[in-house]
Amino acid sequence: MWDWRVKVHIDYREKYIKEYFEKNRDFENIVETKNLEIGDIIIYINEKPTILIERKTVKDLASSITDGRLREQKFRISASSIPKEKIIYLIEGELDEKLYGRVDKKTLQGSLINTMIRDDYKVYRTKDPKESVYFLVRLINKIRNDKSKLIKIENVKEEDKIR
């Protein structure tokens, strides 16, 4: 059996998410608030940064497309040690027909498609902050409790296999 320690760092600017985890005792020894240089949430397994989550509201996505922040953030994330397949863009809110500044629905969808296809990152959509927290709780608990289902067989050394 192998050792499995999970830690989660949440950027201090993620107010709603931070407040939820600060109030929930189930996560008091797992979740810490930090000033993160990249991403909004980083999940560590055995002290190794393993999953990076960049959370954006639809409005923030639109403004980061317009001012170039999205491209710059993706560049910094791609330079990190976290594998592409473990990077998640958590997009919060509805993509409706209204304009977000100069950005329309077609542009927003195009950006999300590029994120998935060109950049090889995962995109997960939620309707609001409450659903985002629900997703994060499920993700963290899945990692904590179902580790044998999350490890790819080819990545497990013979001596680490469960007997």
Write out the residue ranges for each language-model feature.
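Extended, alpha-helix-rich binding/interface surfaces that flank or overlap catalytic cores
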Residues: 2-7, 30-163
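Short, charged N-terminal beta->alpha structural module
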Residues: 5-27
